[in-house]
Regions:
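Hydrophobic anchor at the beta1->P-loop junction of P-loop NTPases
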Residues: 25
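Conserved lysine of the Walker
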Residues: 33
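Interdomain motor-coupling "hinge/lid" segment immediately C-terminal to the ATP-binding subdomain
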Residues: 121-123, 128-230, 263
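Accessory nucleic acid-recognition modules appended to NTPase machines
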Residues: 54, 184-344
Length: 402
C-alpha cells in the first residue's frame, strides 16, 4: 500500500533530532508508530547519508530473544552494536516488552553517543516510575489515526469529498483499515474487530488481570455507545446493574483506565469557562477512531451521526495540538474548548444539522453566555458557511480540509 507521509509528526521528530530528550512515540497498536519510525529513519538517511542508525522492534521474531532478557543484557547488546566514536540514532519499537525497560531507557539516555527514539502501545510505560526517573528528559508524541486529508491520499475521492467523508466516518483512519475499505467495507470492519481483540488480549487482559471478559465488554460497549455524552464510573455501574449486568464502580473505573492507557479512548475533562478551572465530574470519552468504535459495537453508525461528528472534531482538535475540554458556562455546555500552545482559545459547537430553527437556537445559546471574545465556531454537516452574530458556521468537510 502506498504510504502516507505523516508530515506533522515527522516535522516534530526532525525538530527534536539531537536534543537531549528521549523521543517517546505513543498510540494504539496498528496505528502507524513503526511506520513513522521507518519514515523518520529514511528522512534521516536522506539528510545525513552516513548517519549510524540502530533500529530494533521487540515485537519482531528476529528480536524477541532480546525481549526475554533482562534490561542490562539488552543495554549491553545495544551499546555493543553502535559506533562508539560518533552519534548513533537508536530506534526502539514496542519498548514496553522489555522487563524494567525504564532502567534500560535511563541507561541509554545518559550515553553520550545515543539519540534515542522509542515507541509503545500502552501508557503504563509513561508510568509514575518512569516519569520519576526521566522527569524533564522525555517528549511524548502521541500518534492518532489518519486525518481526513491523509485518508483522501490513500482512499481517493477528493473529487467528491462529501461522499469520501461518509466512508471515512464508517471505516476510520487506521492505515490498514483504509486499505481494506477500498476492497470492501466488511473487510475493514473485520480487520478492526481483530485489532480490538488483539489489543484486549495482548495489552489489557493479561497486563491488568481482567477476570470477566463479559463485564469488561459491557463497559467498553457502554463507553463506545456514549461517545460525546457525560459519564462517570458510578453512572455506568448503575445503568449496567439496573439492566441485570451487575458491576461495581471500582471495576468500571479500572476498566476505563485500561482503555485510556491503551489509547483506545481519550478523556475530555469539563472546564468552567467563567471560573477558569477544571471540574472533577461528568467527563466525556471519545474513541481513538470512529471505524474502531463502529467495529467494537458491531454496527453501522446510522442514528449516531451527531456523536460521530463530535468524535471526529475532538480527534482533529488533538491533531492540531490543542488542549481540549468540555466547556461549562452557567447551566449550558459548550462541546469543546480548544486551547493552542500559544494560548489561543476557541469555543466549538458540533451539530449534524441546524436547519431546524430550534436546533440552531439551542446550539448558539451557550455562545451568548461566554464573557470573552475568543473565536466561536459552529461545525455542522449542512452545506452552509456563514457568520451568525459573530459565530462562524462551517461545514465539517470544509473545516477538516482547512
Amino acid at each position: 500500500m502506498e504510504q502516507v507521509v505523516r508530515h506533522m509528526y515527522l516535522g516534530t521528530l526532525s525538530d527534536l533530532r539531537g536534543s537531549n530528550l528521549i523521543k517517546v512515540i505513543t498510540g494504539a497498536r496498528r496505528i502507524g508508530k513503526s511506520t513513522l519510525l521507518e519514515q523518520h529513519h529514511a528522512a534521516l538517511k536522506a539528510k545525513i547519508p552516513e548517519a549510524s542508525v540502530l533500529s530494533i522492534n521487540f515485537d519482531e521474531p528476529g528480536y524477541r530473544f532480546l525481549a526475554e532478557k533482562g534490561w542490562k543484557e539488552v543495554y549491553d547488546f545495544i551499546v555493543g552494536a553502535i559506533r562508539p566514536q560518533e552519534m548513533n540514532y537508536v530506534f526502539l519499537d514496542e519498548i514496553q516488552n522489555i522487563r524494567q525497560f525504564e532502567k534500560l531507557l535511563e541507561g541509554l539516555f545518559v550515553h553520550p553517543k545515543i539519540d534515542l527514539y522509542v515507541t509503545g502501545s500502552n501508557a503504563c510505560f509513561l508510568s509514575s516510575e518512569l516519569a520519576t526517573l526521566l522527569t524533564g528528559r522525555q517528549f511524548e508524541i502521541n500518534i492518532l489515526p489518519f486525518s481526513f486529508p491523509e485518508y483522501l491520499e490513500i482512499a481517493g475521492g477528493k473529487e467528491n469529498a462529501d461522499r469520501a467523508f461518509v466512508n471515512y466516518v464508517m471505516a476510520g483512519g487506521f492505515p490498514e483499515a483504509v486499505k481494506f475499505a477500498k476492497v470492501g467495507e466488511h473487510y475493514s470492519f473485520q480487520y478492526l474487530q481483530s485489532v480490538y481483540k488483539s489489543i484486549y488480549q495482548n495489552d489489557i487482559k493479561a497486563r491488568y488481570g481482567i477476570h470477566s471478559d463479559i463485564s469488561y465488554q459491557d463497559v467498553v460497549n457502554f463507553l463506545a455507545d456514549s461517545a460525546g455524552s457525560p459519564v462517570s464510573p458510578g453512572n455506568i455501574a448503575r445503568v449496567l446493574t439496573n439492566s441485570g449486568k451487575k458491576i461495581d464502580n471500582k471495576s468500571v473505573a479500572k476498566y476505563i483506565s485500561t482503555l485510556t492507557d491503551s489509547y483506545l479512548f481519550y478523556r475530555a475533562a469539563r472546564y468552567d469557562i467563567k471560573g477558569k478551572q477544571l471540574l472533577a465530574t461528568q467527563e466525556k470519552y471519545y474513541a481513538v477512531d470512529t471505524g474502531l468504535r463502529n467495529a467494537i459495537l458491531g454496527k453501522e453508525p446510522y442514528g449516531d451521526s451527531g456523536h460521530l461528528l463530535e468524535n471526529v472534531v475532538f480527534l482533529e482538535l488533538l491533531r492540531r495540538k490543542n488542549q481540549v475540554w468540555i466547556g461549562k458556562v452557567g447551566t449550558c455546555e459548550v462541546d469543546f474548548v480548544a486551547r493552542a500552545a500559544d494560548g489561543d482559545t476557541k469555543y466549538i459547537q458540533v451539530s449534524q444539522s441546524v436547519k431546524n430553527p430550534e436546533t440552531l437556537a439551542r446550539e448558539l445559546a451557550p455562545f451568548d453566555k461566554i464573557p470573552d471574545h475568543n473565536e466561536k465556531i459552529l461545525i455542522t454537516a449542512d452545506y452552509e458557511n456563514c457568520s451568525r452574530n459573530g459565530v462562524r458556521q462551517i461545514n465539517i468537510v470544509d473545516w477538516l480540509l482547512s
